[in-house]
């Protein structure tokens, strides 16, 4: 007993107090973290301050004033011109969501395989993908290879089926929306083309039943419009308040409701498809099957995947189709040349996938329209996950939001008369592989560049050519008198006149060739 008491007494004399030690360690850890964060913050802003900023503003002023943001939204073109006149390598722009380091396209060869620049985090922040109802904008960050793998390893294998299936949807849609009326009548160009592209895409993604299900076709387009307009509305609020405001904002509430409706429609189909595949039953070759094959048991939200696909391609494809049609409405001689090319090639080759790769002039018109008005003034949007050194002394700090300017597509060093629509520009280069519509290059970045260029561009090219073939051989269209279409500028975004009405009528002559696949 005595020995034990002495042992306990001796031990107690040397026992250090636990609470002060933990407090000291915690304080030291927090202090080190804060010092490290402060150091990173200072280094980041020091590096970013080296670049010209044509619409710069202090953090304090930008919180209470929208002046810098408004300059960006209304006149990004002039800001970019001013910036690159001061520094031809890189500039800093205060956009409507953060500061962006905008690089010259000369850096594309260096950036094409750069793994320290990641696209997912940029999209999440720019398009508010962290909010409920906006999940399609964060899907690519959570599962970055999922959709590209499905497109490259599954969907592209079935492109030979596309001409026959899509032509059915084009016929149905145009008969309903453009009608067979042979007198001139007015239609809303963007609205009718959005529905047409959406129906054709759904036919490829989900098959004939869903693409004729009006509520899904409407929801498919309604959600993409609702969520994009919600993003635009919420970005007008201070960033710190967005997570609160979104619960009450009507546009954000509409996006959430539409996503929930999409889940109610897609989830039962997804569950049934999984059961059929597990039982070894025959299943259609569509995205429900392909995503399940690629997922290999990994959980995912099937409705979010479908809407992510829609957001990735629906608006950009529709916008390009509208741009082409507006350009052609001002060049009737090109319309006639396109018709002649179609008749000649279709008579020789028939209505099949390989035929459409031989439409040299149509390729040129699509590529030239995309060059003259891409979907944005910037692309290759990324976040730097580490410090990156580029040529000519340009250093990208860790955490920087980075994009590449598209001004190479309007550079007179790359193109003669770059501001002019030249339908034959790329047709004259047809012996050059880079002249094909779906080919990317440093000079033409309509589909991006490098390993992360659009994986679905071959499908997009085929889909748009099929639609144009129907429009050219079956219809005439023109602009109303005294109407000049205008490109809508909104920050980096460039949108073919979303308000344009066109006058259309069914051609008096029947199509000179069949727009159906020979059986």
Swiss-Prot record:
| GO-annotated cellular components | membrane
Cofactor entry:
heme
Q: Which domain of life is it from?
A: Eukaryota
Its localization reads: Membrane
User: Which CDD domains does the UniProt record give?
Assistant: CYP503A1-like
Q: Does the keyword Nucleotide-binding apply?
A: no
Instruction: Tell me, in one coarse class, where this protein mainly resides.
Output: membrane
Q: In which pathway does it act?
A: Mycotoxin biosynthesis
Which UniProt keywords are listed?
Answer: Glycoprotein, Heme, Iron, Membrane, Metal-binding, Monooxygenase, Oxidoreductase, Transmembrane, Transmembrane helix
Q: Which GO BP annotation is one of this protein's?
A: secondary metabolic process
Q: What class of enzyme is it?
A: oxidoreductase
Identify this protein by name.
Answer: Dideacetyl fusicoccin A C-19 hydroxylase
